[in-house]
């Protein structure tokens, strides 16, 4: 993805009319320069969020009300930001790194909600995504090495980071879930969403799951969800 495509994940014009500032970012894709490779995009997102907060006064932004939106891998990154414990370093010499990395909400489309291959194949038998996050290809190798990389999975999988103090999230998918069944698009299946929603609710975290002809939700799109939670 690219920040030039942000209107695919939330409507910037509607957000601006609602008095909500919009910042779009690019980040590195998974790279061998970091260990594990997924650390690159995720920590780029953290740094961007902290940088925005460091500019709050200059940019006229309320840094206590910031949400994230994204699609696919960007959706996974947004959820990770929403669920991960605060990565601020109050004692850092870098003022940017002293800023909190916590969000007030996240609204995403087509998110991969776990980076645990065991969960993936249990939810969706023809899963094939995620090994690149840890430098393991193909998926079979990813699954075989799961035990060795469990500490990484616990650190970088959104699902593994959910705790009761996390902000509300909104998940949007194109098709209804069917747990345990082969999916036409296993990388963007709403099976990811249903299982995360169950996990969020079990931990007391508000989570809306929207897909066509699904159960009624308070919001039907990412933009309206962001407005609701950022205008509070």
Q: Model-predicted segments: where are they?
A:
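Short substrate-entry loop that stabilizes the transition state in hydrolases
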Residues: 1-35, 76, 88-89, 179
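Catalytic nucleophile-loop/oxyanion-hole region of alpha/beta-hydrolase
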Residues: 4-9, 25-63, 216-217
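Alpha-helical scaffolding within the catalytic cores
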Residues: 6-12, 91-95, 153-161, 194
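Mobile cap/lid helix-loop segments that gate and shape the active-site cleft of serine hydrolases
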Residues: 84-87, 117-161, 167, 188
């Amino acid at each position: 993805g690219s920040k030039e495509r942000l209107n695919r994940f939330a409507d910037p014009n509607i957000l601006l009319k609602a008095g909500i500032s919009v910042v779009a970012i690019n980040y590195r894709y998974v790279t061998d320069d970091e260990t594990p490779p997924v650390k690159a995009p995720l920590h780029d997102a953290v740094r961007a969020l902290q940088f925005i907060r460091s500019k709050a006064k200059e940019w006229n932004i309320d840094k206590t009300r910031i949400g994230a939106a994204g699609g696919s891998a960007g959706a996974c990154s947004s959820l990770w930001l929403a669920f991960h414990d605060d990565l601020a370093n109050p004692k850092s010499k870098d003022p940017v790194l002293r800023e909190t990395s916590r969000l007030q909400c996240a609204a995403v489309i087509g998110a991969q909600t776990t980076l645990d291959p065991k969960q993936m194949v249990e939810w969706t038998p023809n899963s094939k995504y995620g090994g690149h996050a840890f430098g393991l290809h193909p998926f079979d190798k990813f699954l075989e090495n799961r035990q060795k990389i469990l500490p990484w999975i616990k650190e970088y999988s959104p699902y593994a980071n959910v705790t009761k103090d996390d902000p509300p999230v909104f998940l949007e998918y194109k098709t209804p879930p069917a747990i345990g069944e082969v999916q036409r698009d296993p990388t963007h299946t709403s099976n990811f969403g249903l299982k995360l929603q169950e996990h969020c609710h079990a931990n007391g975290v508000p989570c809306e799951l929207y897909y066509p002809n699904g159960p009624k939700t308070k919001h039907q799109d990412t933009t309206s969800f962001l407005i609701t939670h950022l205008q509070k």
